Amino acid sequence: MIVTVFRSRLNPGAQDEYGPMAKHMSDLVRAIPGYISHKGFIADDGEKVTIVEFESEEALREWRVHPEHAKAKKRGIDSFFSEYKFQICSVVRHREWTARTGPGVSE
């Protein structure tokens, strides 16, 4: 599994235009073969953090070179972001645990 962590800060006044574009990118990435999931958060200090999971580096590459995503990245640099950084990580170990809610509950 490949995890990307995208951290950014928007320029003042950019949210109104950025929001619809970000929503469109969110819809597009779901169609990439090998896409697993993504979630976004806004920290108390205003930093936006998006975590995206892909099955492979090839799936990530497909997203990276997607024509609409490429245009959105350029627009982000030119208009929306005061700063950004991203990290691409290979998952070394993965564990999950879910508490059972009680007897008689099916999973």
Q: Could you tell me what each predicted segment is?
A:
Residues A72:
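Short acidic (Asp/Glu) patches
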Residues M1-K48, E55-V65, F81-E107:
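Short S/T/G/P-rich N-terminal loop/turn motif that feeds into the first structured element of a domain
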